[in-house]
Amino acid sequence: MFSFYFNDNKITKLLMVGYGSTGKSVCDFLANFIDITVDISQNDDEFVNYDLGSYDLITVSPGIPLNKSPYRVLTKFKDKIVSDIDIFYQYIKDTKAKTIAVTGSNGKSTVVTMTDFVLKDLGYKSILVGNIGTPALNKIGEKFDYCVVEVSSFQIDLFNCVRFDLGCIINVSPDHLDRYQNFEQYKQSKLNLAKFSNDFFVYDVHNNGIKYAGEYQIIRGAIYRNSTKLLDIAETKLFGEHNLENIIVVLNILDRLGLDINQAIDSIKKFKGLEHRCKIVKKVNGTTYINDSKGTNVGATIAALNSITNSKNIILLLGGVAKGGDFSLMIKSLDKYVKYVYIYGADKEYIESYIKGYCKYQLCNNMKQAFELASQKANSNEIVLLSPACASFDEFSGYAQRGEVFQNLVAQLEQKS
């Protein structure tokens, strides 16, 4: 066994703040080293008892709110704070592996998953880590050609010395305003990814015209490279113009990696998309039920509404924990595509205050009641869409469980029909 070094400095004492999946991955990794003491702070009461200045390094889990007491004090020790991805980078930086980091409010999970899928389909060894669910350090012993990393703004705030070969920001819209003072601060957190990337591009920041599309453009539901048609959405297993936008981001990533785009197009045609992201569950009694439980902010729900239909035939299930979201931003899409809204969850009155007077709606006790009322109201050729624009932890363990419950409710409805 060896001692643990970070930036060529021997680390003998480390404090871990937070012990979720990320914290556990750090702890498991450090178990491979000797001469290091690791203290773990798992809650507020424990944290205040530690002398932060006595530690060589402090690792902080992304879920720890640095803007709230008692954790604000951590900002005074910025030079000691590292993320799990910084540690991961220290141990792969001298290999030939390429690292790609993607952040954004909406679409980043689709982009990183599609990128990883294409790389593997082209015959490369690729790993997918980060905010998508697998901590980077869990993959430290594997050999790979490419490492695709989904990063959140919370993770970027913790970065110390990581250097990605390529960084990319997509689709930044208001989110996590319970954690940031305003949208500008949140957007800047995302843009800070550039400081940790050797190459970098931005594809759309809140429709402010900051968009690098390279040689690609969308014309009538298809992607063109200059004047050559590459791909029609109908040739894929995806739907909606937002997925064409996601594909353009992936193509630009692959371009910058120097890979063959024509071969990549064949791989993209096989990609099935993500669970709980604009997935058709079933058609029951002529009504189509769509699961977009991964739509956890206003921007994601707007993207779903704008992509699913050209008619005013959506019955929308909306609600959960709003995270300070600005629901007035969806009024235009509600007016154009939504027949009725069922609002549920912890912040239903908050959501109501934004959309009252702009659409027909009803408040519900929970998602199950919202579903039951929606299925009763829906007619043939209409759509019941779960795209909550909210986090799920008031009622569920996460967006995946919320989506699974929705799918089960659809299955039960089909059995009764």
UniProtKB/Swiss-Prot annotation:
Keyword field contains Metal-binding: no
Family statement drawn from the similarity comment of this UniProt entry: Belongs to the MurCDEF family.
One Gene Ontology CC term in the entry: cytoplasm
One Gene Ontology molecular-function label: ATP binding
Annotated protein name in UniProt: UDP-N-acetylmuramoylalanine--D-glutamate ligase
GO biological process: cell division; cell wall organization; peptidoglycan biosynthetic process; regulation of cell shape
Uppermost EC category: ligase
Binding site for ATP: G104, S105, N106, G107, K108, S109, T110
Organism: Francisella tularensis subsp. novicida (strain U112)
Top-level taxon in the UniProt lineage: Bacteria
Known catalytic reactions: UDP-N-acetyl-alpha-D-muramoyl-L-alanine + D-glutamate + ATP = UDP-N-acetyl-alpha-D-muramoyl-L-alanyl-D-glutamate + ADP + phosphate + H(+)
Function (record text): Cell wall formation. Catalyzes the addition of glutamate to the nucleotide precursor UDP-N-acetylmuramoyl-L-alanine (UMA).
Main location: cytoplasm
Keyword Transmembrane helix: no
Pathway(s) served: Cell wall biogenesis; peptidoglycan biosynthesis
